[in-house]
A protein has these predicted regions:
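Histidine-centered, transition-metal-coordinating active-site segments
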Residues: 1-207
Length: 207
């Protein structure tokens, strides 16, 4: 990039970081994603326990099978065919049908996703203390069956780095013909360090 583009790149990188935390890693997005993951995990757990879980063919194939690297090598066309055929409609159709499933956890998660009664999400710059997690867990046990609580209390972390200097750094073509890394020529360098936030996701007290 020519030297005159330095500040445009800086503005782009700042906007990129803001987009990640305000859009892609927004609380609502992360909460919904984690709930969807747990819904599928519950469906998979039920199948492995011998419980019938109805789903469209492409999704059902993965619920009732445990693919390995060897499976993809030996039955490549079959596995990839099912994977390529899996889409949002399969997932939403399954979740809608699970709203009437006998299993409480699967039914509860499905109803919440369809009706947008999403879990609360807390972000923290530091890992949550064991005491705090235990406190939330105890509160959930007063509302949900104890065996179901691990599904309703989700913990994890999200990381994002707006720019990295160790791989594929942007190169600037200076007026004198030199080619220098962007981090060396920017007056207001964007911090390359990765930002990590820890989260807890669980049902709201009134929902």
């Amino acid at each position: 990039v020519e030297e005159k583009g330095i500040y445009s790149i800086e503005k782009f990188l700042v906007a990129r970081r803001l987009m990640y935390w305000q859009v892609y890693l927004h609380k609502t997005v992360v909460a919904a994603e984690q709930m969807l993951v747990r819904t599928m995990q519950r469906a998979k757990d039920l199948v492995q326990a011998g419980v019938t879980v109805p789903a469209p063919e492409n999704l059902s194939f993965f619920l009732y099978n445990n693919p390995s690297a060897d499976d993809f090598r030996q039955r490549r066309e079959e596995w990839i065919g099912y994977f390529a055929g899996l889409d949002d409609y399969d997932v939403m159709s399954a979740i809608k049908s699970w709203m009437r499933h006998d299993d409480f956890v699967l039914r509860e998660f499905s109803e919440r996703l369809i009706n947008r009664r999403l879990f609360k999400l807390e972000f923290s710059n530091e890992p949550f203390s064991d005491a705090y997690v235990a406190k939330i867990s105890q509160q959930l046990k007063s509302v949900y069956p104890e065996a179901a609580v691990p599904y309703f209390l989700l913990a994890g972390k999200e990381s994002n780095s707006a720019y990295t200097t160790f791989k594929d750094e942007i190169k600037m073509l200076m007026k004198n013909g030199q080619v220098l890394p962007w981090s060396q020529v920017s007056d207001h360098s964007v911090q390359p360090a990765s930002v990590t936030k820890y989260y807890l996701v669980y049902p709201k007290a009134d929902a």
